[in-house]
Amino acid sequence: MTRRLLIAACILTLCVPALALAQPAAARLTILHTNDTHGHLMPFSYPAIAPAGSALEQMTERSNIGGMARRAALAQKIRTEQKGRGIPVWLVDVGDFCDGTPFSTEYKGEADMAAINAAGYDFATFGNHEFNNTLEQVRKLLGQATHPILLANAVDRATQKPLGQAWRVEKVGGVRVGLFGMVTREAATYPAAKEGVDILDEIKTATVTVQTLRKQADIVILLSHGGEDMDKRLAAEVPGIDVIIGGHSHTRLPVGEFVWRGDDLKQNDINGTVIAQAFQWGGELGRLDLLFEKDASGVWRVSRYRERLLPITQDMQAEPMVAAVVDRFWQPIAARFGEVVGKAAADFSSRGDDEAPYNLVADAVRETYNVEFEMENTGGVRAPLVAGDITRADLVTLDPFDNRVILFKATGTQIKDLLARYAPYVSGLRYRLVDGQVVEATIGGRPIENDRTYAGATNSYYAGLALRDISQENTGRMRLDVLTGYVKDKGTVTPAYDGRRVVIGQRRRDGR
C-alpha cells in the first residue's frame, strides 16, 4: 500500500510541471470597431470623385456603402468564423453616433442606440455629440444601452461619479484584459455637460485609471473619443496602454498606427501602443486582430497585431432583426425626409480649400438675408451632396445642427480679425490667409476698408464662439430651413469652386 502511494506521489510530482507547461502561452482576440457613425443607420454614398489626397480617395468602395444591418451581418459572420477557431470577438463603438442624419435629429440618439443594441455591440464609449442633448437624454441613452458604456472622464458634477462605467476587466483565455473609455474635453462645451457633467483631463484620468487597471489586468485597452493627436499623446505619455481604439478626428487608418515607447525591444514585446480608427459613418468596419504572448519575464504583451478596414458593400446581406429596428424608426419619418426638394447639377465636394457644401450654405444665407457677407465655421457643415436628386434627408445630413441665423455688423478690422483667428468659410467675401495673417481680403470685389461697417450673417454656434464682443440679432430661423428654401427656389444648384477662401500654413479649427 505504501509502495503504491509512493508511486502515485511520484507520478503526480512528474505531472505537475507538465500541467504547468500545458497552460496557454498565448491568446488571441479580435476587436471589430466603429466610430463617428453620426446617425448613418442606412446605406449612403460619397461623391464619385474623391478629393485628391483625402481619406475618401483611399477607399475602394464609396457608393451605396455602410448601413447598420449590413454591418451587423458582417460582424456576425466574423464572430462565427472566429468562434470556430476558438477566438473571441468584441464589437465596440467609440462614440458620436448622434448628430448627422434625420435619425439623430428626430430621435436624439434613441434610434441609434436601439440599432446598436440589436447589432450586439459588446462595449462602447460616448463622444462629444452624445452630449449635444439634454443631460436627461444622455442619462436615458445610458439606461437604454444593453452593453457597458465606458466613460472614465465624464463625471456627474454633484457626485463626481462616472456617468457610465469607468473601467472593467474581461478574461480572454488566460489573459485579463482591462478596458476603459474617455471622451474629448471638447464635450464640456456641449449642452448636457453644461447642465451638470464635468469632463476631466484625458491624460490625468488615463494615468490614474491605468494604474488602477494594471493591478488587476495584464493588458489595457482604451476606447478613446479624443482624436488622433490625443491618442498619440496618450500612447506616448501614459505608460501601460497597449491598444487605443480611437474616434473623434474621423481619421482613416487602414493598417493602424504604432507609437513606440522606449528603445529596449525584447522578444514578444512590441513595446508600445497600437492605435486604430475607422474613419466615419460606418462605411467600413475596423478589424483589429491581436495576439497576446508572455515575454521572457512572464508578463503578457501584445506581440502581434493586424488592423484592416473592411468595406461594407451593397452585395452584403442585411441582418434581418437589425434591419427591422432601423425600418421601425425610419417609416414614421420617411415621407417627410424622403421628399425631393431640388437637384444637384454635380457633386458638392472639396477641391483644395474650396468646399462646395460650405459655399452652398453660406450663399444661401447671404442671398436670403441680402447681407454683404456670410461666415461659416469649420465643422459646421457635415457632408457632401451627391449629384442628382436632393432630399430633405440629404440636407439634414449636410446640416444636422440646431443652428439659427444670426445677423450682425462689423468693421473691416473686426472682419479681418475673424478671418485670421478662425479661417471661416464665406460668401460675398474673398480672402487669402498665410500663416495666420490676412494678406488679401475683399467684400463685393473691393478691398475691405478697416473703418467701414459691413452687414454680415452667420450661424448661432459661430456667433457664440467668435462674435462675443459684436452686437448681433438672432433671427430665430433655423439655418437648415433657409438652406431648404434656397434649394427649392433654385430648383437646381451647382457647386461653386471659385477660390473664395485660400488658407496657407497653419489652419485654425473651431468646429465640431
Regions found by a protein language model. Give the residues of each.
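Feature captures C-terminal
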Residues: 27-30, 40, 50, 146-153, ...
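Bacterial N-terminal signal peptides that target proteins for export
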Residues: 1-8
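Bacterial N-terminal signal peptides
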Residues: 8-18
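Acidic, metal/ion-coordinating pockets
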Residues: 22-314, 321, 352-364, 405, ...
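Hard-cation-handling environments
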Residues: 298-390
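Flexible, glycine/charged-enriched surface loops at secondary-structure junctions
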Residues: 88, 220-223, 336-342, 372-378, ...
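Short, compositionally biased low-complexity segments
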Residues: 37-47, 303, 331-342, 389-393, ...
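Alpha-helix initiation and N-capping motif
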Residues: 135, 318-330, 334-337, 341, ...
